[in-house]
A protein has these predicted regions:
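Conserved beta-strand and immediately adjacent loop positions that scaffold enzyme active sites
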Residues: 1, 31-33, 346
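Extreme N-terminal starter segment of soluble prokaryotic enzymes
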Residues: 1-3, 255
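Short acidic, Gly/Ser-rich segments with clustered Asp/Glu that frequently serve as metal-coordination loops
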Residues: 7-15, 20, 264, 467-468
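Metal-dependent phosphoesterase core characteristic of DEDDh/y 3'-5' exonuclease domains
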Residues: 15, 25-70, 88-213
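Short consensus segments that form the blades of beta-propeller domains
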Residues: 21-26, 339
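Glycine-rich phosphate-binding "P-loop"
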Residues: 67-78, 144-145, 259-272
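Glycine-rich, highly charged phosphate/nucleotide-binding loops
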Residues: 75-85, 409-415
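Phosphodiester-processing cores and adjacent nucleic acid-binding clamps
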Residues: 128, 212, 216-480
Length: 480
């Protein structure tokens, strides 16, 4: 028999080659769907289960892909033990395990079995993958490695075989039906052969005698997970965020200062000239401005000199600017580990005195001399050594807290926040961003909650990469 299965998860692993015993590396399974077919391809059993996330939550970016929210999974999900038991009962009947990019799904279920203390159940099964060089050469989609054709996604393979799309891609239930249909079609059309699996001839003969053209759909109904999740959404993501009017006394009393600015010294990332940054700061009557270039402080001297020249001008004596020197560093797990790519989280450091400035220089240098791997990096051990005299901002959506909210989970984001506060105490701040992106509202709601629960101050920052609205196009060209 053939068991064809697919999973939906909380995200992707950091290390694709990590063992399944590395539970922190492998994301959690939140939907498991499978079909059991007999040796002639007839559908024997079909199942699709949401899994109740008892000890984790489903991050926003993952929900955007498959539509399964934490609320939906808690409402309709079964316990992991129950789902695994149902799956293993059918798995025991199978000789062949089939999937699209099936190694990932095997690792996901293998990691869940490990968490439950159950030994791997896949060792005795013959694995058949519909995402290989064989299907790559069938679809002939350019863009693969070393000039080869790229491995097709399930959508691309399905479209090539049947000249049609399938509804609800990334719903494991729909993906399994599409994978099943694709698998039996490439058997029927002799894309696979006897060398690919032992019982090919029997299945091939049956399919050819019963399907004169393409393999048909199985007529299964699939729940629209995105619609179901949307029904459970709160009325407004803004209901807990108080927006003050521009003439509010609080705003007038506390003038805004830009604390997260990149300049042209953030190579290929920003079009801002330091002279224009200082000029615009003065134009808006801001009392201070920060320079926080990416992983380097080459612009610090030019920045300080530009501000000093402005302040030394007699006509500016009543409108002096305070220069704040900082840097945006990449904080990874282990800056000495170059066995896999880990760019880390982009974190903003500001020097509040000379000691902080010197420590920031040291950390910045170590990122290049010791930690460079794709990008300059340091780790939290380095931060603990050189934290004195520094202020830390949580960063934008690429900072650790915000990134974990979007891609890992609320609990993990909160644990990371606790670490930063334990080191920097009152010199740690949470950045509220409003870039007009949907993600901002998701992040801001939780940051406000974290701020209240952990007594951490919020600051308003938008990541500045160009000075004027007219420079936006030039910045886009730079990134391309």
């Amino acid at each position: 028999m053939f068991l064809i299965f697919d999973t939906e998860t909380t995200g992707l692993p950091k290390k694709w080659n990590a063992p399944i015993s590395d539970s922190a590396n492998w994301p959690r399974c939140i939907q498991l769907a499978w079909q059991l077919h007999d040796n002639n391809g007839k559908l024997i059993n079909n199942n699709s289960c949401l899994i109740n996330p008892n000890d984790f939550d489903i991050p926003y970016e993952s929900e955007k892909v498959h539509g399964i929210s934490t609320a939906l999974a808690k409402k309709n999900g079964l316990d992991l033990n129950e789902v695994i038991e149902l799956f293993l009962n059918d798995l025991k009947k199978a000789k062949y395990l089939v999937g699209h990019n099936v190694k990932f799904d095997i690792n996901i279920i293998g990691a869940e079995l490990y968490r439950l203390g159950i030994s791997s159940q896949f060792n005795d099964l013959h694995v058949i993958d519909t995402c290989t060089e064989l299907t790559a050469n069938l679809c002939k989609i350019k863009g693969g490695r070393a000039g080869k054709f790229k491995f097709p996604t399930l959508i691309e393979l399905y479209d090539f075989l049947f000249k049609e799309s399938f509804d609800q891609a990334h719903n494991a239930s729909a993906d399994v039906e599409a994978t099943s249909r694709s698998f039996f079609e490439i058997v029927r059309s002799d894309v696979l052969s006897k060398k690919d699996f032992e019982d090919f001839n029997q299945l091939n003969n049956y399919l050819k005698s019963n399907y004169s053209s393409k393999i048909s759909l199985y007529g299964l109904d699939h729940v629209n997970l995105k619609q179901e999740s949307s029904k459970l959404k709160q009325v407004s993501t803004n209901k807990n965020i108080e927006i003050l009017n521009s003439n509010d006394k609080v705003i007038n009393k506390n003038p805004f200062v830009h604390l997260h600015n990149n300049s042209q010294f953030s190579v290929l990332q920003s079009t801002s000239r330091i002279s224009e940054l200082v000029k615009k700061t003065a134009e808006f009557n801001m009392p201070a401005v920060a320079l926080t270039d990416k992983a380097n402080m080459m612009g610090a001297f030019h920045f300080y000199r530009a501000v000093k020249n402005f302040n030394d001008d007699d006509k500016n004596q009543s409108n002096k600017i305070k220069p704040i020197i900082g840097c945006e560093l990449n904080i990874c797990e282990n800056h000495n580990d170059k066995s896999h790519r880990d760019d880390g989280y982009q974190t903003v450091f500001l020097a509040k005195n000379k000691t902080g400035y010197q420590n920031l220089i040291k950390m910045c240098s170590l990122g290049y001399t010791d930690g460079f791997y794709y990008v300059p990096r340091i780790d939290k051990e380095v931060v603990e050594k050189y934290f004195e005299g520094l202020i830390v901002l949580s960063g934008d959506k690429y900072g650790e807290i915000s990134n974990k909210i979007l891609n890992v989970g609320e609990k993990q984001a909160e644990e990371a926040l606790k670490w930063w506060k334990s080191i920097f105490k009152n010199d740690y701040y949470l950045e509220i961003n409003r870039h007009g992106e949907e993600e901002d509202e998701i992040i801001n709601q939780l940051l406000i909650s974290f701020s209240k629960n952990h007594d951490i101050k919020l600051i308003a920052t938008n990541t500045s990469k160009y000075i004027s609205k007219e420079d936006a196009n030039a910045h886009d060209i730079l990134l391309c």
